[in-house]
C-alpha cells in the first residue's frame, strides 16, 4: 500500500482530473493554474511555465495565458481545467461531467470535441462520467453503473 504522500504523488503524476466545475484558483492566471501540478511535482518554475504555455496553446488558449479565471468565459475556464489535467502527460484523465457546467450547444459540444481530439492525438485514455446518453455513445467504450455494478453490453466489467 502507498503512504498518503506516495498516493498523492502517484495521482499528481499519473492521473489527470477534470471536474464539472473547473475549480481554478481565482487569484492565479490561466498559465499559473496549469503550472500548479508541475510545481507541486517540484518542476522548475521556468520549465513549468514553458510546458503550461504549450498545453494551453494545444487547447486554443495561447492568447489567454495571463487572464485570471474571472476574465475567461465558462468554456475557456473549462479548457484551462483540461490543460491542467494534461500538463503532466498522465496515463489517464478522469472527467466528471466535463461539459455539465456549459450550455449543451456550441460550448459544451466544442469542449467534448476537443476532449475526443486530444484523446486521439495524445493517445490518451479519457474516462468520462456522464448522465447524457448522447455523450456516452461517442465513446469508444460505454459502461453503465447499475445497482452498484459496472455493466457493458450485458456483461459485468472487471475493474
Give a label for each model feature.
Residues 1-138, 142-146:
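ABC family nucleotide-binding domain
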Amino acid at each position: 500500500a502507498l503512504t498518503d504522500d506516495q498516493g498523492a504523488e502517484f495521482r499528481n503524476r499519473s492521473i489527470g482530473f477534470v471536474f464539472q466545475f473547473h475549480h481554478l484558483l481565482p487569484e492565479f492566471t490561466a498559465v499559473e493554474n496549469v503550472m500548479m501540478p508541475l510545481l507541486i511535482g517540484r518542476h522548475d518554475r521556468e520549465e513549468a511555465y514553458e510546458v503550461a504555455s504549450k498545453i494551453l496553446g494545444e487547447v486554443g488558449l495561447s492568447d489567454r495565458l495571463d487572464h485570471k479565471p474571472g476574465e475567461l468565459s465558462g468554456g475557456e475556464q473549462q479548457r484551462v481545467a483540461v490543460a491542467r489535467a494534461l500538463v503532466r502527460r498522465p496515463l489517464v484523465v478522469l472527467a466528471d461531467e466535463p461539459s455539465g457546467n456549459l450550455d449543451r450547444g456550441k460550448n459544451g459540444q466544442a469542449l467534448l470535441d476537443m476532449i475526443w481530439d486530444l484523446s486521439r492525438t495524445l493517445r490518451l485514455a479519457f474516462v468520462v462520467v456522464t448522465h447524457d446518453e448522447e455523450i456516452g455513445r461517442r465513446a469508444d467504450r460505454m459502461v453503465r453503473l447499475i445497482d452498484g455494478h459496472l455493466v457493458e453490453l450485458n456483461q459485468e466489467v472487471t475493474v
